[in-house]
């Protein structure tokens, strides 16, 4: 744990250092204002200006600074109406939502008043005003969305969203001439994004009849020439120009397109999901700037040829923050996402020896099993990672190791635990928690007979709200996990399963329409959080699902997503570094979920400051109460003091991000963890369980009679045997 903390501290230092270095960098706007994000950007000369929620920021010569402080406008950014109070109105008027430039001057636009400002010397100076009807649709009383903004040849180009509720996807290009104050609307339809052009008024991307980027002439209102057609589902984000060539971002790559339509990969940016409407900019020196959340990525595209970075191709999904932070710490390695997440295509890529895929993130149970069993995964011989992997819960080790060889590392864990509202359960004196389905049905009977009328806002268990087919599906899933053998065979023609189905049939009246229960469940059949979470001060406590029969050990079934390396990859050393990085930087909760050795509680980062503020406010109220002589005012202060004390008690419930009690409860449950990753009937990544579910729906959609149990079992067995034969 000490090592992890040291690494995290080092990472913060590295991020700060990298963000202000020359070359390819990632500016982090939270370094100048907490919670800041980049909304809009443009270059004026060699200075990059970025508009965020709280200000306009400038980056020049490796220095990031605040150019204009707009933090007082934060509360008014989405207020469409001008406040009546003049002080508030003066702040509202400067709540700009976009910045743009003519190459010499920086401008900002207020999206509701239509006021255009010059941004100079740390201030917003009114410059000109858009006609009201450009942005405001009077007939339907709403403001049009501004999807794109750029300026060229003295004209402001605004790509606007729909002007009527019947055509939600409609866009319209409005052109405002600064000199004449005239407004023109383009007749071109299907425009999705715009950018400042070179040798033309504008670059537009249309997605109407064709997926095409055009050079646009405002005087003729025509697309003069085609820049390029895009294939398939590709869409350009962050369009800009550099030395007469189009530059845009798609699929983690910054492309440069020449006049013949040929494109080169000039750089990589760790953004998996790019929006067409995202604006970008490129300086005269060839530094391309692309915003994403709190970061602005700068990439030098001035060098000849394509990027020489080591590129790892990942098939699967990881946290976007993980990719961003890895790229900052390892600028020489780019991780890009493959186009598909389809499990069969993952296996096909491995089977064919496709060396273009370096990394997989696959599910267990699911695609992981075939990759492991058929030898498609590379050994991960990173010593520190292997040592760490051997400290994980045994059920996880059983999945990721092949003997002593590490084949992958878990990056997320999905648990099939249940949850009980411990607070209300104890308040209602409901006794012991049920540990078998028979006990659960008995508890439901007692609830319906003795509690339901008195507690209409609650119900005993959510299985009362899912129908017999949902209940049987849950039981079958647990039965398969417990009884499927190593070859993938499972028989439902057993006394255990037959008795259980008979029990369901005998108790189906509990789930009949006359016993419908739609209050908040005291027992929920899903995982709500690590150990203990809170809902309106009620303690929601993790519990193990009931067993199928009395005397059985309660178990905790789980699925994991495993990051692993393709045996065909030619970049395995870089891939190992990425896996090790991800393992080291998993989110805190996942670290606790997979490591039994992590037992130190974690205090909430906001707890102390919040508690100090509330206690200070309470002391002020108590002082005022002690000095107050007016009885009526004292009564009011008493109410305020009581309310403040309740707030303090509520905050104290949230003292811990990870509490000692949560750790104890989770570790006790996780000792019974099993991951049936070899199952042919897993509900994650296999058709086998889907076929069983179809049988259950056929026989149980309207309930289950005892006379139907044999037929249900026969059909489940038939499907189970068929799945077994297909896999052998």
Residue ranges, per PLM feature:
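Surface-exposed loop and turn segments in beta-propeller and other repeat-based domains
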Residues: 68-90, 128-142, 271-272
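Conserved C-terminal helix/tail region of periplasmic/extracytoplasmic solute-binding proteins
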Residues: 290-292, 605-728
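Conserved N-terminal structural module of periplasmic/extracytoplasmic solute-binding proteins
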Residues: 22-23, 27, 31-42, 49-50, ...
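Hinge/lid segment of periplasmic solute-binding proteins
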Residues: 365-417, 541-545
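Extracytoplasmic "Venus flytrap"/periplasmic binding protein-like
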Residues: 332-392, 426-428, 519-520, 530-535
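Extracytoplasmic/periplasmic substrate-recognition and gating elements
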Residues: 534-612, 623-632
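Extracytoplasmic/periplasmic solute-binding protein
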Residues: 407-411, 416, 439-491, 515-523
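Glycine-centered hinge/linker elements that transmit conformational signals in sensory
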Residues: 444, 473-515, 536-548
């Amino acid at each position: 744990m000490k090592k992890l903390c040291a690494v995290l501290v080092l990472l913060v230092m590295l991020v700060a250092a990298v963000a202000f270095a020359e070359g390819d960098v990632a500016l982090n706007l939270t370094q100048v204002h907490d919670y800041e994000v980049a909304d809009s950007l443009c270059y004026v000369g060699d200075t990059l200006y970025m508009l965020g929620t709280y200000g306009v920021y400038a980056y020049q010569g490796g220095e990031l600074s605040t150019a204009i402080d707009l933090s007082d406008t934060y509360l008014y950014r989405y207020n469409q109406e001008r406040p009546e109070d003049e002080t508030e109105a003066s702040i509202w008027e400067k709540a700009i939502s976009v910045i743009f430039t003519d190459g010499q001057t920086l401008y900002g636009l207020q999206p509701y008043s239509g006021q255009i400002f010059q941004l100079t010397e740390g201030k917003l100076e009114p410059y000109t005003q858009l006609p009201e009807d450009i942005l405001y649709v009077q007939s339907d009383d709403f403001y049009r969305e501004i999807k794109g903004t750029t300026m060229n040849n003295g004209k402001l180009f605004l790509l606007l969203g729909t002007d009527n509720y019947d055509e939600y996807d409609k866009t319209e290009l409005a052109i405002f001439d600064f000199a004449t104050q005239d407004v023109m609307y383009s007749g071109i339809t299907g425009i999705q994004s715009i950018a400042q052009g070179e040798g033309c008024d504008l670059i537009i991307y249309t997605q109407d009849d064709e997926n095409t980027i055009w050079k646009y002439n405002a005087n003729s209102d025509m697309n003069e020439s085609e820049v390029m057609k895009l294939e398939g589902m590709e869409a350009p984000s962050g369009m800009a120009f550099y030395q007469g060539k189009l530059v845009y971002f798609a699929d983690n790559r910054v492309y440069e397109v020449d006049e013949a339509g040929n494109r080169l990969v000039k750089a990589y940016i760790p953004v998996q999901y790019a929006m067409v409407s995202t604006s970008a900019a490129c300086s005269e020196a060839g530094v391309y700037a692309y915003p994403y959340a709190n970061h602005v990525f700068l990439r030098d595209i001035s060098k000849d040829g394509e990027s020489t970075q080591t590129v790892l191709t990942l098939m699967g999904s990881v946290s976007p923050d993980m990719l961003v932070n890895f790229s900052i710490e390892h600028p020489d390695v780019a991780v890009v996402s493959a186009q598909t997440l389809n499990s069969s295509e993952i296996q096909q890529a491995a089977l064919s020896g496709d060396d273009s895929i370096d990394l997989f993130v696959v599910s267990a149970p699911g695609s992981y099993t075939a990759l492991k069993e058929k030898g498609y995964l590379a050994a991960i011989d990173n010593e520190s990672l292997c040592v760490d992997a051997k400290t994980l819960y045994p059920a996880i080790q059983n999945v990721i190791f092949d003997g002593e060889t590490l084949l992958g590392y878990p990056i997320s864990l999905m648990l099939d635990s249940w949850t009980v509202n411990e607070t209300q359960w104890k308040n209602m004196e409901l006794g012991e928690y049920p540990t078998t389905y028979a006990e659960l049905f008995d508890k439901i009977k007692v609830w319906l007979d003795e509690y339901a009328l008195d507690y209409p806002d609650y119900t005993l268990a959510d299985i009362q709200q899912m129908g017999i087919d949902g209940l049987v599906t849950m039981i079958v899933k647990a039965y398969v996990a417990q009884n499927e053998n190593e070859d993938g065979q499972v028989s439902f023609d057993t006394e255990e399963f037959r008795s259980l189905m008979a029990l369901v049939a005998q108790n189906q009246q509990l789930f009949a329409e006359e016993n419908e229960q739609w209050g908040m469940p005291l027992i929920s059949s899903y995982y709500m959080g690590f150990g203990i979470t809170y809902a309106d001060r009620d303690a929601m406590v993790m519990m193990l699902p009931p067993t199928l029969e009395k005397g059985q050990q309660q178990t905790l079934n789980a699925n994991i997503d495993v990051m692993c390396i393709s045996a065909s990859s030619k970049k395995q050393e870089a891939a190992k570094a990425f896996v090790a990085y991800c393992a080291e930087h998993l989110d805190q909760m996942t670290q606790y979920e997979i490591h039994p050795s992590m037992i130190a509680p974690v205090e909430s980062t906001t707890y102390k400051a919040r508690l100090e503020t509330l206690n200070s406010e309470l002391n002020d109220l108590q002082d005022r109460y002690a000095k107050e002589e007016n009885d009526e005012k004292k009564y009011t202060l008493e109410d305020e003091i009581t309310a403040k004390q309740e707030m303090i008690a509520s905050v104290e419930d949230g003292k811990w991000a990870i509490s000692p009690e949560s750790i104890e409860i989770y570790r006790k449950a996780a000792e019974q963890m099993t991951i049936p990753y070899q199952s042919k009937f897993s509900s994650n990544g296999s058709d086998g369980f889907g076929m069983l579910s179809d049988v259950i729906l056929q026989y149980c959609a309207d309930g289950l009679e005892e006379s139907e149990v044999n037929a249900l079992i026969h059909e489940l067995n038939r499907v189970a045997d068929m799945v077994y034969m297909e896999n052998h």
